[in-house]
């Protein structure tokens, strides 16, 4: 009877250790996955900051990162709460606002610099993303 009790305690102790080891291993795997996703996201931001003027497709960035567009989209959303396109739009709008505020370039020149097919396309894009036209933005930021 005592031998059975000892064997049972030994078995339960071994089982408990195995379960804790499994849980610890899963935590390590989860951390490694998070780290990989963070690395992918950081690399995406780096590549996007260098290419947003000419490359606006998720496929381009996914190919550069050697991952699928679907996975890149999931990583961006999970890591930052924003989609790949929202990030690209942020880069473009930030550049547009900077140029409108700090340069004397015409809206046509800015549209060309930002790789829009026409000033009209740029104007529609800017209004959709900034809430006002490029001209209105430029006028609102001028020092009186």
What are these regions, as identified by a protein language model?
Residues 1-9, 14, 46:
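Amphipathic alpha-helical segments enriched in hydrophobic/aromatic residues interleaved with Lys/Arg
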Residues 2, 17-42, 50, 54-60, ...:
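Short, Lys/Arg-enriched, Trp-marked, Pro/Gly-tolerant hinge/linker segments that flank
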Residues 48-52, 100-103:
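Short helix-to-turn junction characteristic of helix-turn-helix DNA-binding domains
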Residues 59, 70, 106-109, 119-120, ...:
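Residues within helix-turn-helix
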Residues 65, 114-115, 126:
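Core residues of bacterial helix-turn-helix
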Residues 72-73, 121-122, 126:
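Short hydrophobic/aromatic patch on the recognition helix
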Residues 78-119, 139-144:
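Terminal helix-turn-helix DNA-binding modules in bacterial transcription factors
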Residues 124-144:
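…primarily DNA-binding HTH/wHTH and HhH modules…
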């Amino acid at each position: 009877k005592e031998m059975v009790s000892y064997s049972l305690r030994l078995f339960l102790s071994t089982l408990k250790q195995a379960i804790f080891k499994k849980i610890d291993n899963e935590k390590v795997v989860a951390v490694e996955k998070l780290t990989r996703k963070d690395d992918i996201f950081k690399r995406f931001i780096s590549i996007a900051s260098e290419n947003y003027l000419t490359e606006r497709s998720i496929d381009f960035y996914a190919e550069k990162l050697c991952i699928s567009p679907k996975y890149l989209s999931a990583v961006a959303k999970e890591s930052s709460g924003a989609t790949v396109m929202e990030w690209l739009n942020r880069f473009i709008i930030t550049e547009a606002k900077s140029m409108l505020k700090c340069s004397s370039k015409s809206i046509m020149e800015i549209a060309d610099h930002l790789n829009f097919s026409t000033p009209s396309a740029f104007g529609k894009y800017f209004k959709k993303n900034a809430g006002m036209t490029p001209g209105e933005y430029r006028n609102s930021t001028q020092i009186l």
